[in-house]
C-alpha cells in the first residue's frame, strides 16, 4: 500500500534530533538558586515573618489588653445600664406613676373623706331639687327612669339629668345613674374594699334589690323585685360557691387592672 512506503520517511523524523534539547532545559538553571544558602535563608526568613506576624499579634500584651477592655466595655454597657441606679430609679418612678398613682390617690384618707363629702352634697342637692323645682327646673329630674317614669322625660337628655358638683355623672344610686358607669369607675382597690366591706346582710340586700339578675339597684324609679332564688339558695351560693378566696381570684384574674381601666 501507499502508506507503507512512508515508513522509511518516519525514520528520518526531524523531531528525534531535538532530544538533546531536553537535557538543556532552562528550568535546570534555577537549581543553583535553590542550592544558594543565602537565598534559602531569605525564604525561610519570609516564612518565619509571615508565621510570626499572627504570633506577635496574639502575644502583644497591649493589644490583648485593648481587646479585653473593648469586650469588657461591650459587656458592661448593658450591666452598667441595668445597674445604673438613676435608670432604675427612673423606671421605678414610671411604674409608680403609671400603676400606683391611682391606688395611692384612692387610699388617701383625705381624698376618701372628700368623696364622701361630695356624695353627701350631691344627695342634698337632689333633695333641694325636689323641694325647689321652680329654681332648678328640668335639671332636677333624673331623666328617662326618673321619679315619675318615662312620662316626665323632657326629651332633652342634657336637661333631664341631675347636675352635681362634678358635672353630669351616671353613678349607681344617684338620680339618673347607671350601674355600669359606677362599676367601671371603680378601680381594683375600690373593688376590693367594697367587696370585703360587705357583710352577709349587705350582700342579701344588694342581691334582692336587683331588678333583673345581679344588676345592682335600679334607683327610685325602677321596680323592686325579688330574684328567683330563695334565701336558702342565696345563702348556700354565697357561703360555699363564692368563698373569700373565690371572690379574690375573680377580682384579681378575671378582671385585671387593664380590663378595669378599659
Swiss-Prot record:
Renumbered residue ranges of the record's region 5 X 6 AA approximate repeats: 177-206
Additional free-text comment from the UniProt record: Autoantibodies against CDR1 are found in patients with paraneoplastic cerebellar degeneration.
Gene: CDR1
Positions annotated as Sequence repeat: 3-8, 9-14, 15-20, 21-26, 27-32, 33-38, 39-44, 45-50, 51-56, 57-62, 63-68, 69-74, 75-80, 81-86, 87-92, 93-98, 99-104, 105-110, 111-116, 117-122, 123-128, 129-134, 135-140, 141-146, 147-152, 153-158, 159-164, 165-170, 171-176, 177-182, 183-188, 189-194, 195-200, 201-206
Name listed for the protein in its UniProt record: Cerebellar degeneration-related antigen 1
Keywords associated with the record: Repeat
Lineage: Eukaryota, Metazoa, Chordata, Craniata, Vertebrata
Region 23 X 6 AA approximate repeats: start-end pairs: 3-140
Residue segments, region 6 X 6 AA approximate repeats: 141-176
Tissue specificity remark: Brain; predominantly expressed in normal neuroectodermal tissues and in certain malignant tumors.
InterPro entries, per the entry: LED_rpt, WKTW_rpt
Amino acid at each position: 500500500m501507499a502508506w507503507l512506503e512512508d515508513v522509511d520517511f518516519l525514520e528520518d523524523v526531524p523531531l528525534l534530533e531535538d532530544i538533546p534539547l531536553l537535557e538543556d532545559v532552562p528550568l535546570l538553571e534555577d537549581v543553583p538558586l535553590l542550592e544558594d544558602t543565602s537565598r534559602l535563608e531569605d525564604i525561610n526568613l519570609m516564612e518565619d515573618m509571615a508565621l510570626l506576624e499572627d504570633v506577635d499579634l496574639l502575644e502583644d500584651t497591649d493589644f490583648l489588653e485593648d481587646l479585653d477592655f473593648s469586650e469588657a466595655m461591650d459587656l458592661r454597657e448593658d450591666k452598667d445600664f441595668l445597674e445604673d441606679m438613676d435608670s432604675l430609679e427612673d423606671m421605678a418612678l414610671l411604674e409608680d406613676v403609671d400603676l400606683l398613682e391611682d391606688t395611692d390617690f384612692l387610699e388617701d384618707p383625705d381624698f376618701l373623706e372628700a368623696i364622701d363629702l361630695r356624695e353627701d352634697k350631691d344627695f342634698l342637692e337632689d333633695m333641694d331639687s325636689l323641694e325647689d323645682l321652680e329654681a332648678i327646673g328640668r335639671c332636677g329630674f333624673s331623666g328617662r327612669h326618673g321619679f315619675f317614669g318615662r312620662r316626665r322625660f323632657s326629651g332633652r337628655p342634657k336637661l333631664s339629668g341631675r347636675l352635681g358638683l362634678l358635672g353630669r355623672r351616671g353613678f349607681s344610686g344617684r338620680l339618673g345613674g347607671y350601674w355600669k358607669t359606677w362599676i367601671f369607675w371603680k378601680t381594683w382597690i375600690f373593688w376590693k374594699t367594697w367587696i370585703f366591706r360587705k357583710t352577709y346582710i349587705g350582700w342579701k340586700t344588694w342581691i334582692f334589690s336587683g331588678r333583673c339578675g345581679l344588676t345592682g339597684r335600679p334607683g327610685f324609679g325602677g321596680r323592686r323585685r325579688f330574684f328567683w332564688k330563695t334565701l336558702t339558695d342565696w345563702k348556700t351560693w354565697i357561703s360555699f360557691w363564692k368563698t373569700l378566696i373565690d371572690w379574690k381570684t375573680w377580682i384579681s384574674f378575671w378582671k385585671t387592672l387593664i380590663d378595669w381601666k378599659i
